Amino acid sequence: MTEPNRAQAPAQNKAAADTPAVDENKIIAERREKLAALRQQGVAFPNDFRPTHQAAALQAQYADTEQATLEAAPVEVAIAGRMMLKRVMGKASFATVQDGSGQIQFYITRDKVGEEVYAAFKHWDLGDIISARGELFRTNKGELSVQVRELRLLSKSLRPLPDKFHGLADQEMKYRQRYVDLIVSPETRNTFRARTDAISSLRRHMADAGFMEVETPMLHPIPGGAAAKPFITHHNALDMQMFLRIAPELYLKRLIVGGFERVFEINRNFRNEGVSPRHNPEFTMMEFYAAYTDYRWLMDFTEDLIRKAAIDARGSAVLTYQDRELDLSKPFHRLTICQAIQKFAPQYTDAQLADAEFLRTELKKFGVNTNAPQFLNAGLGTLQLVLFEETAESQLWEPTFIVDYPVEVSPLARASDTVPGITERFELFITGREIANGFSELNDAEDQADRFRKQVEQKDAGDEEAMYFDADYIRALEYGMPPTGGCGIGIDRLVMLLTDSPNIRDVILFPHLRKED
């Protein structure tokens, strides 16, 4: 911070490493005493101040305004925020105040605010929420500041903030106490602003393309729409077991049957599975369905959506992710599963990739248990897919659509008319992570019923992620569903890319954590 013409600011505080350890309990006790005194005065938590300006807007609007202009045409402001820095110097003081948009400096003098208020201000603490009315001026070093005329304490902070040099050093504490992380870390605030910008971009472009946003149930009588283990709960009024949804797909396709030809939903999915840097049991997806389209149309549309989201959220389609360039402006690659394997593991021949027994033997070298329930009836396509996951998936840095998924792992996708055993399905990978999954939808009710039966057989054999038989969805298909394409985009993983975040918990405001001790 810089000082105004009338005063000389003191030197900056020393680094936290030079600061003696503080007794947090003692600080909290002292602040509670201050709050008790405020309560006695009847002014502990006033709620009659209304800001007229925000810090960032003022900084932008008056960035080039000189002091002479501000003196000639005074700008009255009313602004409030959290006190992040305080420097008391006799009859004049500085305070850096942070609101929801940014920071601005207050210049507070005893002559302007009065002796009583100034004396009280000296006892206010970092973290307190304060308000000011006054005029803008520029310090002799050019910093835009507020010459405070009226100063108030709006909310007393009882807990000390982390030191400004290190913030929250413990990563888990950042997730657990996100409210503190947001206070002290502009990077965290920018991450979640970018998340909002990306989601707003998706919504805007979906509306421009004629899609209607809808809301479908979060509690399902039958889990469906994905291969995943659900969370289970109980509906007391109906006395029935319910499942938190693992995907909205089957309900959205019911709407296609009903005549809404373009629908989408952005909402939570829940999967009772593991936690990792790219998996959270509660996550956000956007799923969309368009009648009279297929998976080729979906790939073009999805590519355009993601490119626009990057531009809207970050200002460019060329990003840096984990110190590597990520160019979303170029056309996305398209490879079959076998083409991707041979690109990154060229030692495999066409003949080997067509040999199921060879693939089973090869997968064991990667530690894959091919005797697990999901492999009991695995065909060639499934074995190829698992080999792809072991050899190629993590190396797909540039945006790449992987196509031609086998029918046996795609129970809701339309089968290819030209290649037996293959579906019109894709998955989009960027930086080695799956970002989207889409396909031409299966609209043959009899074929869908048969695939559900096979899924039930797999579940009975021990595959917990196999799908249930959804008789009502089959009934809906029997009324006739037009040719349709559908896709799901993982919002959290997309935001990871756009914000250079290595862990999915970095882009979820309140991620799941183990119970606090």
Curated annotation (Swiss-Prot):
It catalyses: tRNA(Lys) + L-lysine + ATP = L-lysyl-tRNA(Lys) + AMP + diphosphate. Mg(2+) 2 binds at residue 434. The keyword Magnesium applies. Keywords: Aminoacyl-tRNA synthetase, ATP-binding, Cytoplasm, Ligase, Magnesium, Metal-binding, Nucleotide-binding, Protein biosynthesis. It is an enzyme of class 6 (ligase). It comes from Cupriavidus taiwanensis (strain DSM 17343 / BCRC 17206 / CCUG 44338 / CIP 107171 / LMG 19424 / R1) (Ralstonia taiwanensis (strain LMG 19424)). Residues 7-20 have a biased composition (Low complexity). Mg(2+) 1 binds at residues 427, 434. This is Lysine--tRNA ligase. Binds 3 Mg(2+) ions per subunit. GO terms for molecular function: ATP binding; lysine-tRNA ligase activity; magnesium ion binding; tRNA binding. It is found in: Cytoplasm. Its cofactor is Mg(2+). One of its GO terms (biological process) is lysyl-tRNA aminoacylation. It holds the Pfam family tRNA_anti-codon. InterPro entries: Aa-tRNA-synt_II, aa-tRNA-synth_II, aa-tRNA-synth_II/BPL/LPL, Lys-tRNA-ligase_II, Lys-tRNA-ligase_II_N, Lys-tRNA-synth_II_C, NA-bd_OB-fold, NA-bd_OB_tRNA. NCBIfam families: lysS_bact (TIGR00499), PRK00484.1 (NF001756). Its EC number is 6.1.1.6. Disulfide bonds: none annotated. Homodimer. Residues 1-21 are annotated as: Disordered. Its main location: cytoplasm. GO terms for cellular component: cytosol. Belongs to the class-II aminoacyl-tRNA synthetase family.
